[in-house]
UniProtKB/Swiss-Prot annotation:
This is ATP synthase epsilon chain 1. It is found in: Cell inner membrane. SUPFAM superfamilies: Epsilon subunit of F1F0-ATP synthase C-terminal domain, Epsilon subunit of F1F0-ATP synthase N-terminal domain. It is a peripheral membrane protein. It comes from Photobacterium profundum (strain SS9). Keywords: ATP synthesis, Cell inner membrane, Cell membrane, CF(1), Hydrogen ion transport, Ion transport, Membrane, Transport. Produces ATP from ADP in the presence of a proton gradient across the membrane.
């Protein structure tokens, strides 16, 4: 028996990264992890830097890094809007690790001209990218 699906769009400021049928989607919401399946109650919520894990129509998994954004759930359509979205296999582990190191350094060595909130945001994004890279490697 075929799984019940819904239409999913993952759209960044630059391009549409995914548009198709999905069995489920998992994102990091502002209130915690969200799992969306067909028939989910309509919802509009902020999403935090992290990933969107898509289970496509025939069970294939795709993981995409998101810099944060919005998630909208309608009866037959789910839309993820984000400033930055990068497929897990396209992320650069060395670059993400360096960004994490730099953000940690900025937080440790705070001076008047360093914006703590920006450094914390950069750290969260780098950690999220490293997590997506790790999960992408495991799913191959």
């Amino acid at each position: 028996m075929a799984a019940i699906t819904f239409h999913l769009d993952v759209v960044s400021a630059e391009k549409k990264l995914f548009s198709g049928r999905a069995e489920s989607v998992q994102v990091s919401g502002s209130e915690g992890e969200l799992g969306i399946h067909a028939g989910h109650t309509p919802l509009l919520t902020a999403i935090t830097p992290g990933m969107v894990r898509i289970i496509k129509q025939h069970g294939e998994e795709e993981i995409i890094y998101l810099s944060g954004g919005m998630l909208e759930v309608q009866p037959s359509t789910v839309t993820v809007l984000t400033d930055t979205a990068i497929r897990g296999e396209d992320l650069d582990a060395a670059k993400a690790a360096e960004a994490k190191r730099q953000a940690e350094e900025q937080i440790r060595n705070q001076h008047g001209d360093i914006d703590f909130a920006q450094a914390a945001s950069d750290l969260a994004k780098a950690i999220a990218q490293l997590r997506v890279i790790e999960l992408t490697k495991k799913s191959r």
